[in-house]
């Protein structure tokens, strides 16, 4: 199914793709949950209640670490990518390129069963 939201068209997104997006966001700079969710929401119609368990899983698997930092009088939890997370990101990027190339091949008529 496709969800139309304003000028955006959302396709269903797997948890693995969300993991890939999260690791990509955090690789460029340490980020807090809401900031990550806003970036992921550019392509995926997800709720914070979906995002936070995935962040927890990435942390449990050793791909992310967390630290707290004060912002406007409140503690904010930041996520930082680990070396294992960077390795996972490289792997997921290769998988994404292969997947994207296959879809492009089908759309462009280069791939048929």
Region annotations inferred by a language model:
Residues 1-9, 79:
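A positively charged, amphipathic N-terminal helix/segment that binds anionic biomolecules
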Residues 10-50:
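N-terminal helix-turn-helix DNA-binding core of bacterial DNA-binding proteins
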Residues 38, 83, 98-101:
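Generic recognition of well-ordered alpha-helical segments
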Residues 52-57:
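Short, hydrophobic-biased segments on the C-terminal half of alpha helices
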Residues 71-93:
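Basic, amphipathic "hinge/linker" alpha-helix immediately C-terminal to the N-terminal HTH DNA-binding motif
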């Amino acid at each position: 199914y496709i969800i139309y939201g304003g000028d955006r068209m959302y396709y269903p997104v797997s948890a693995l793709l969300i993991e890939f997006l999260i690791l990509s966001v955090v690789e460029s700079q340490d980020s807090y949950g809401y900031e990550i969710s806003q970036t992921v929401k550019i392509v995926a119609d997800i709720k914070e209640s979906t995002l936070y368990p995935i962040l927890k899983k990435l942390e449990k698997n050793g791909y992310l670490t967390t630290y707290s930092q004060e912002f406007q009088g409140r503690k904010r939890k930041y996520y930082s990518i680990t070396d294992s997370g960077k390795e996972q990101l490289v792997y997921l990027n290769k998988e994404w390129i292969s997947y994207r190339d296959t879809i492009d091949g089908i759309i462009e008529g280069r791939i048929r069963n």
